């Protein structure tokens, strides 16, 4: 039981937080669209819909290749890298001024997030949990999506009416929700370990 609690703290909890941040950065475009048209006259409903969909083109194209790359390197470091990357993309979205830039940033965001859940499901969770334990670990981690939906709307509403270092509306939303991804990428790299034999908090008996 003690080992299970420690795995919840050191494995499931950091993955839970990563999943929340990923989901918020993925869907905040829906809320940002409420004010983006004020500054971007070219953002017609057709352009907005295309940009929202282009995210999934990047996601689908790179989901398998990126996951294969992650399997060949340290999966924990890979998650930290892609998290840092999608945070930067979200920050860069505050600078977009053209339709093409909108499409490019949405594609890059999909590319960066593409391998997150495959790496979690196929590498990190299996490294830490026996087959009979994985369903519980994954279900607990996936409650992050429900939690994200609960906080996402109210948080977006607040940020859209907030000025942050001279930025207002949708730009505030993008940058404030991107900062946690950039910062937590470094925290995750030290907090999470790829497998039990890499973790100092796992005893020799538990590693066996």
What does each of the following model-derived ranges do?
Residues 35, 67-68, 158:
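Membrane-interface helix termini in secondary transporters
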Residues 105-143:
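Cytoplasmic helix-loop-helix junction between adjacent transmembrane helices
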Residues 61-100:
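Conserved MFS/SLC helix-loop-helix module at the cytosolic interface between two early adjacent transmembrane helices
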């Amino acid at each position: 039981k003690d080992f299970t609690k420690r795995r919840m703290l050191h494995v499931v909890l950091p993955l839970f937080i990563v999943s929340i941040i990923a989901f918020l950065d993925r869907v905040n475009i829906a809320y940002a669209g409420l004010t983006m048209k004020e500054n971007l006259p070219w953002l017609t409903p057709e352009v907005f819909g295309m940009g929202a969909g282009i995210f999934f083109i990047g996601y689908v194209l790179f989901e398998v290749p990126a996951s294969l790359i992650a399997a060949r390197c340290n999966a924990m470091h890979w998650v930290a890298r892609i998290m840092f990357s999608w945070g930067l993309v979200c920050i860069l979205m505050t600078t977009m001024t053209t339709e093409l830039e909108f499409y490019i940033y949405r594609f890059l965001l999909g590319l960066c997030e593409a391998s997150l859940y495959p790496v979690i499901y196929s590498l990190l969770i299996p490294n830490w949990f026996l087959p009979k334990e994985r369903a519980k670990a994954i279900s607990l981690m996936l409650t992050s999506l429900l939690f994200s939906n609960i906080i996402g709307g109210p948080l977006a509403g607040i940020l859209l009416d907030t000025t942050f270092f001279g930025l207002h509306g949708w730009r505030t939303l993008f940058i404030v929700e991107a900062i946690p991804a950039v910062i937590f990428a470094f925290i995750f790299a030290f907090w999470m370990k790829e497998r039990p034999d890499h973790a100092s908090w796992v005893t020799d008996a538990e590693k066996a």
